[in-house]
Amino acid sequence: MTNISLTIKAANDQKYAVTVDSESSVLALKEAIAPVADIEKERQRLIYAGRVLKDEESLKTYKIQDGHSIHLVKTLGQNPAAAATNVSDRTQQVPTNIQAGQGANNPLANLTSARYAGFNIPMPSASMFGPNPENPVPPSTEELANMLSNPMVQSSINEMFSNPQMLDMIINSSPHLRNAPPYVRQMMQSPEFRRAMTDPDTMRQMAQLHQQMGAAGIDPMSLMGGGLGGAGLGGLGGAGLGGFGGANNATAGIAGAAPVDQTAAANTIQNLLNNLGGAGFGAGLGDAGLGAGLGGAASPPAPAQDTRPPEERYAEQLSQLNEMGFVDFERNVQALRRSGGNVQGAIESLLSDL
């Protein structure tokens, strides 16, 4: 038997050297990696030449030789106790410290970043990989629109607003929402609101309108009466921008709703978007003008869109993916767009398509 030395490349350019028997299984390699990388073997995903290594296979199966490099991706894992817990029980035990950050205790972390999508969907959370040095700029309107085109994201958002526990957490996390009248909860649970929150065309139209008004020196809020149901846009819903229930009453479409203070309503919904804003989702919505369309405080003009071709915009990320063996340019670019430019998220997307 012959020992071989391998270089394990992890996130943030971390490298580990491990020595194993050349006839070892992939599982044995993971066991050797665990103590040096401080990642349990169950949470390791090893990639070599664009292929995910299977535990039961031997290193020889993949023609791995002395001096070769293997890429390590840390995946979402569960401890035995968590695995034995019923899913419905877990969803009811939602923490209330959403504003504490995007850590593992924030159940919206998977949903509120352009990198990842999904509450109760087996996607990695943004906090798993730490800061995102590859793409510190908030995602663009088009990237957010692409994310909203993903059925998994749409399903996640719909599930979130349909889940009473999640809705309670969102409302209780903010003084604006906590003190809001009952119609706000009704509106958040309405199909029109969910459709607007998951409609990429609405985002694009709002962004375009916001940019045009900003370029002309016009405050969009001056045309909307400062509220959810201003003339012209009428809030959300309808044909993308038509309104919940009329030009002057954002809740007219909700049975039994009384007239409301539109400024208070605007602040309430803007605060909701801020809560959803984790690492860029809410910020992106605000920059796109959707926050302003909902009647919140007027947001600054959206930054200029990055019009560079993808081979320039994602040059560094594409190089990393090519090094791992992912050489299909179109698939790589599509994955990077879905992940907001994050390499780790793109890897998960590419592997999920295999």
Swiss-Prot record:
Record-linked CDD domains? UBA_Dsk2p_like, Ubl_Dsk2p_like
Is Ribonucleoprotein a UniProt keyword of this protein?
Answer: no
Q: Which Pfam families match?
A: UBA, ubiquitin
- Matching PROSITE patterns: UBA, UBIQUITIN_2
Q: Which domain of life is it from?
A: Eukaryota
Gene Ontology molecular function: polyubiquitin modification-dependent protein binding
Domain Ubiquitin-like: where?
Answer: 1-78
Which keywords describe this protein according to UniProt? Ubl conjugation pathway
| Domain UBA: start-end pairs | 309-353
Q: Name one GO cellular component term.
A: nucleus
Which InterPro entries does the entry link to?
STI1_HS-bd, UBA, UBA-like_sf, Ubiquilin, Ubiquitin-like_dom, Ubiquitin-like_domsf
| Gene Ontology terms: biological process | ERAD pathway; proteasome-mediated ubiquitin-dependent protein catabolic process; ubiquitin-dependent protein catabolic process
Q: What does this protein do?
A: Protects ubiquitin chains against dissambly by deubiquitinating enzymes thereby promoting protein degradation.
Per its UniProt record, what PANTHER family does this chain match? Answer: FI07626P-RELATED (PTHR10677:SF3), UBIQUILIN (PTHR10677)
Q: What is this protein called?
A: Deubiquitination-protection protein dph1
Q: Taxonomic lineage per UniProt?
A: Eukaryota, Fungi, Dikarya, Ascomycota, Taphrinomycotina
